[in-house]
């Protein structure tokens, strides 16, 4: 049955060394409920754990294989996985990176994390380490990583990950957009002090627990009162708000209205305008760049997400 999955992955253009890793790992060993083997090796999402309180899925294999392909996963690499679930994807990646590589997988649910630990131990997989906790903090003791591989929807790529990623390292990540409630995946490469990357495709993952899923609430605490500065008319304001969300990591919301909570100012986003209180040079610079790019949506832009630097966009991908 695993051979069937191998050929499905090959149809997606997946490299042999990645597709073959799926041949080596029995997916059924990571499922807590019984499925017919013919179903297990379909290219579909499967529920891997559900006790009525906590829930985990085994992601669609072709999507995981494409993620591995896009980050260039290969022998000897060190990978930080966020959202380990019951361990199947980490186990597959362990075969791709080989004995000299390492997969460090973080799972927020302690109950599910312990299941994942038992699963890889039972199969004798020695180059996977499971850490039970909030993936927001990464796992600094095993850094730097060549790849950060995210299999849950997150609100941001936190600075902790940026710090733990090698220069030139890659991040593949589904990001929860607060306005449209979409969950597009992005591929980024570290070029200090930026993550530079672009949109890849639409996804739908379980939303991360902990700090990776509560950015609106955390940013709400940053809101302060500043004197009114000025009002600027906005074309296609919903697109600009999503760029602010992706690039600044400072978006929040109160009663259906979105705000940028900056260090020296606040921006209120309305249907066709934005109101600036205090100073918000990051937003004004971003607006100028966006206008010069023809008001394009993020799918058609290159994103430069700054860490201790203003984020910006470029018009060509």
UniProtKB/Swiss-Prot annotation:
Function in brief: Catalyzes the methyl esterification of L-isoaspartyl residues in peptides and proteins that result from spontaneous decomposition of normal L-aspartyl and L-asparaginyl residues. It plays a role in the repair and/or degradation of damaged proteins.
Stored Pfam families: PCMT, PIMT_C
Assembly and binders: Monomer.
Origin: domain of life: Bacteria
Annotated GO CC locations: cytoplasm
InterPro entries in UniProt: PCMT (IPR000682), PIM_MeTrfase_C (IPR009107), PIMT_C (IPR049284), SAM-dependent_MTases_sf (IPR029063)
Enzyme class: transferase
Active site: 59
Name of the protein in its database record: Protein-L-isoaspartate O-methyltransferase
This enzyme's EC code(s): 2.1.1.77
Keyword Repressor applies: no
Keywords from the UniProt entry: Cytoplasm, Methyltransferase, S-adenosyl-L-methionine, Transferase
Gene Ontology MF terms: protein-L-isoaspartate (D-aspartate) O-methyltransferase activity
Disulfide bridges in this chain: none
């Amino acid at each position: 049955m695993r051979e069937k999955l191998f050929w499905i992955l090959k149809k997606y253009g997946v490299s042999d060394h990645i597709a073959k890793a799926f041949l080596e790992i029995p997916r059924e060993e990571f499922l807590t409920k019984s499925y017919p083997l013919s179903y297990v090796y379909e290219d579909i999402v499967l529920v891997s754990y559900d006790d009525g309180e906590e829930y985990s899925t085994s992601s669609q294999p072709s999507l995981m294989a494409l993620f591995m392909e896009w980050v260039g996963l290969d022998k000897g690499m060190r990978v930080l996985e966020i959202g380990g679930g019951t361990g199947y994807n980490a186990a597959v990646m362990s075969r791709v990176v080989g004995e000299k590589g390492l997969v460090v997988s973080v799972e927020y649910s302690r109950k599910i994390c312990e299941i994942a630990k038992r699963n890889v131990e039972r199969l004798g997989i020695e180059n996977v380490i499971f850490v039970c906790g909030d993936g927001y903090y990464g796992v600094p003791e095993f850094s730097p990583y060549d790849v950060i591989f995210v299999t849950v929807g997150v609100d941001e790529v936190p600075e902790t990950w940026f710090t733990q990623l090698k220069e030139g390292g890659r991040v593949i990540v589904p990001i929860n957009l607060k306005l449209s409630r979409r969950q597009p995946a992005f591929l980024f490469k570290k070029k200090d002090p930026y993550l530079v990357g672009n949109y890849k495709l639409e996804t739908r993952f379980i939303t991360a627990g902990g700090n990776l899923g509560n950015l609106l609430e955390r940013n709400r605490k940053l809101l302060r009162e500043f004197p009114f500065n000025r009002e600027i008319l906005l074309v296609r304001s919903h697109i600009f708000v999503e760029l602010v969300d992706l690039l600044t990591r400072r978006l929040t919301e109160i009663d259906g209205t979105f705000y940028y909570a900056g260090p020296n100012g606040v921006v209120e986003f309305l249907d066709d305008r934005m109101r600036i209180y205090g100073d918000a040079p990051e937003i004004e610079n971003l607006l100028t760049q966006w206008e010069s790019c023809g008001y394009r949506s993020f799918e058609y832009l290159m994103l430069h997400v700054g860490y201790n630097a203003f984020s910006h966009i470029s018009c060509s991908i």
